[in-house]
Amino acid sequence: MSRAKGAKAEEIGALFLQDLGYKIIDRNFYAPFGEIDIIAQKGGVLHFVEVKSGANFEPIYNITPLKLSRIIKSAQYYLKQKKITPPFCVDALILRGGEVEFIENITL
């Protein structure tokens, strides 16, 4: 996915989350292990959200065990940098053909 397409998908994802009552805390957070697309909060829980989009395939398949491991390490790095210890989870926002699917607390 090009940077422009990725940025557009992340913008759509952030607006989608806001419509669901999430507060966007940060976007495109870079850690030594990788990037977190969106960091949002709802009900005292931090959500580290990976955004994937695609028209000709299932974007969820791009979240591999290695990618999930890097997201978790990046989330832990974020929490350590901010010196906070809230409950958190890793979510996926899938954009496909104009539709948005939100998958909370992904595991592989």
From Swiss-Prot:
Xref: InterPro entries: Restrct_endonuc-II-like (IPR011335), tRNA_endonuc-like_dom_sf (IPR011856), UPF0102_YraN-like (IPR003509)
PANTHER family named in the record: UPF0102 PROTEIN YRAN
Family the UniProt entry places it in: Belongs to the UPF0102 family.
Organism per entry: Wolinella succinogenes (strain ATCC 29543 / DSM 1740 / CCUG 13145 / JCM 31913 / LMG 7466 / NCTC 11488 / FDC 602W)
Cysteine disulfide links: none
Protein name: UPF0102 protein WS0451
NCBIfam families in the record: PRK12497.2-4 (NF009152)
A molecular-function term among this protein's GO annotations: nucleic acid binding
